[in-house]
Regions:
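Transmembrane beta-strands of outer-membrane beta-barrel proteins
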Residues: 47-53, 77, 93-101, 154-160, ...
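Residues on the lipid-exposed face of transmembrane beta-strands in outer-membrane beta-barrel proteins
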Residues: 51, 55, 79-85, 138-146, ...
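Residues that define the transmembrane beta-barrel architecture of outer-membrane proteins
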Residues: 45-47, 73-79, 131-138, 152, ...
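Flexible, solvent-exposed loop segments that connect beta-strands
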Residues: 62-70, 106-131, 165-173, 212-214
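Short loop/turn motifs that connect adjacent beta-strands in outer-membrane beta-barrel proteins
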Residues: 37-46, 86-97, 147-154, 191-197
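Bacterial N-terminal signal peptides
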Residues: 1-5
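Short glycine/proline- and aromatic-enriched beta-strand/turn motifs that initiate or cap beta-hairpins
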Residues: 9-87, 215, 220-231
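Structural signature of outer-membrane beta-barrel domains
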Residues: 56-58, 102-108, 161-165, 204-208
């Protein structure tokens, strides 16, 4: 009878609080989901608020545009505020609309004056160069993130907008307003569930769309970094 009582007591002890045990299991599972990869996934309707900045070390002529002598010595600095909204998402990918407000764009060694001298042996062209400041808006942007559930997310993007400079860019007769077209890639590294660092490179193209004068575009690879918060 004593043995029977011990067995009965153990059985009662094991099933005394089944609801509490189940709740503990649920809490544990939810904690694993938050602390695991799935907690880093962005969902449809998620908003991004961020800032980024970067620059290029040298303009490129690989894709046409400026001549070698016109592109020489040029650098470009840019800083922007970012708003993004996730349009569609699953565990593998996320598609986002992006808008960038650009308060600062600096084209260094920009050609502001061009002089050509005719000599008996040919012609000599000289340039006057200076830093030219501007700003603008990039309202048309799409970004596709991969590995949406992971903490580190590779992405590709394409953007279009415009910049207004204090002087014509990239040539003296090109006009102060320029259209921009960008395409690039990078990674987002989430430092917490709602904050991320961004590292990337983008091909940045500037041209006036044949609105005035010369339409030889300025092309450059911009390396940049940024920080974003998601809500």
């Amino acid at each position: 009878m004593s043995c029977s009582g011990v067995v009965s007591l153990r059985a009662q002890s094991g099933s005394e609080h089944p609801a509490i045990d189940e709740a503990a299991k649920v809490d544990s599972t939810q904690g694993q989901e938050i602390n695991g990869n799935s907690g880093y996934a962005v969902r449809r309707g998620t908003n991004e608020f961020g800032v980024w900045g970067g620059g290029s070390f040298q303009a490129t002529t690989v894709f046409g545009g400026l001549h070698e002598d016109e592109a020489r010595g040029r650098k470009f600095i840019i800083a922007a505020f970012r708003y993004g909204r996730t349009l569609a998402a699953n565990d593998s990918m996320a598609l986002q609309y992006t808008l960038d407000v650009v308060p600062l764009a600096v084209a260094t060694n920009n050609i502001t004056q061009q002089t050509t001298l005719i000599t008996p042996t040919g012609s000599i062209t000289t340039f006057r160069r200076e830093a030219t400041y501007g700003g603008g808006l990039t309202p048309l942007g799409l970004q596709l993130d991969f590995r949406n559930s992971a903490r580190v997310k590779p992405f590709v993007h394409i953007n279009a907008g415009g910049l207004l400079f204090a002087k014509p860019v990239p040539l003296p007769d090109a006009g102060k307003f320029a259209f921009t077209l960008e395409g690039g890639t990078g990674v987002r590294i989430f430092t917490s569930l709602r904050r991320a660092l961004t590292l990337g490179v983008r091909l940045h193209h500037i041209s006036n769309g044949n609105l005035s004068g010369s339409n030889r575009g300025l092309n450059q690879f911009i390396f940049y970094a940024g920080f974003s918060a998601f809500k």
